[in-house]
Curated annotation (Swiss-Prot):
Name of protein: Ribose-5-phosphate isomerase A
Active-site residues annotated for this sequence: E109 (proton acceptor)
S-S bonds: none
Catalysed reaction, written as an equation: aldehydo-D-ribose 5-phosphate = D-ribulose 5-phosphate
GO CC term, one of those recorded: cytosol
Entry-linked Gene3D superfamilies: 3.30.70.260, 3.40.50.1360
Assigned protein family: Belongs to the ribose 5-phosphate isomerase family.
Residues binding substrate, per UniProt: S30, G31, S32, T33, D87, G88, A89, D90, K100, G101, G102, G103, K127
Gene that encodes the chain: rpiA
GO biological process: D-ribose metabolic process; pentose-phosphate shunt, non-oxidative branch
Length: 238
């Protein structure tokens, strides 16, 4: 990651933390930008600038980081509300539709985003695209005994799906739910994310896919202007 990209991520993470208020239950996302947000939240709590905050994490890594920083946590099943969820994205299109799941935790991320009263997406400017899936693969979480069948069905839908392999262990990536991940590319990208999310999730053996449709309320973008990192709230198109 370049120094400029790090500056963009830091700026947008700080802007998101600034929207957290005392007494909130906050969904804590996953990924590099979300990690900076969690660190910023922990620092504000430690300094007494925020209080009575409860976090709901979306990944094991986020849970460990938040606990190390002293952020009180609550399980999703024990939560009757989430006031605000903050998470990153791998791609964002002009209509605020997203691809997430580069870290293979999109199931929990989607559950938290869906529960939240307000969902803020934090990205740097490199994550903005005109069409989803032209560059970033679409993750699909599948039952271990169904990945070949799902791979075949995705092919019939025009997608090329490959089993995601681990880099620090032999064999495939295994999700927090004990499932596998197929990474899918559609040749011309995804023209109708809403329909495709539904169609993929209707395939037997699929738990969830990484299309987040009609969930984001605001997209904060970190960008560099005149050599200085800043943040803007993206205007939704369509």
């Amino acid at each position: 990651m370049s120094d400029l990209q790090t500056q963009m991520k830091q700026a947008v993470a700080e802007a998101a933390v600034a929207q957290i208020r005392d007494g909130m239950v906050v969904g804590l996302g996953s990924g590099s930008t979300a990690a900076l947000m969690i660190e910023g939240l922990g620092a504000r709590l430690a300094a007494g600038q925020l209080r009575d905050i409860v976090g709901v994490t979306t990944s094991f890594q986020g849970e460990v980081l938040a606990a190390e920083l002293g952020i009180p946590l609550r399980a999703l099943n024990a939560t009757d509300r989430i006031d605000l969820a903050i998470d990153g994205a791998d791609e964002v299109d002009p209509s605020f539709q997203l691809i997430k799941g580069g870290g293979a935790c999109h199931v929990q991320e989607k559950l938290v985003a869906d529960r939240a009263e307000r969902f803020i997406v934090v990205v740097d400017s490199t994550k903005l695209v005109r069409c989803l899936n032209l560059d970033f693969l679409l993750p699909v979480e599948v039952l271990p005994g169904a990945w070949v069948q799902v791979q075949s069905r995705l092919k019939s839908m025009g997608g090329v799906a490959e089993l995601r392999m681990a880099t620090r262990k032999a064999g495939p990536v295994v999700t927090d739910q004990g499932n596998l991940v197929l990474d899918v590319r559609f040749e011309n990208g995804i023209s109708d994310p809403i329909a495709l999310e539904r169609d993929i999730n209707n395939l037997p053996g699929v738990l969830e896919n990484g299309l987040f449709v009609n969930l984001a309320d605001e997209v904060l973008v970190g960008e560099i202007k005149d050599g200085v990192a800043g943040v803007r709230s993206l205007d939704r198109v369509g």
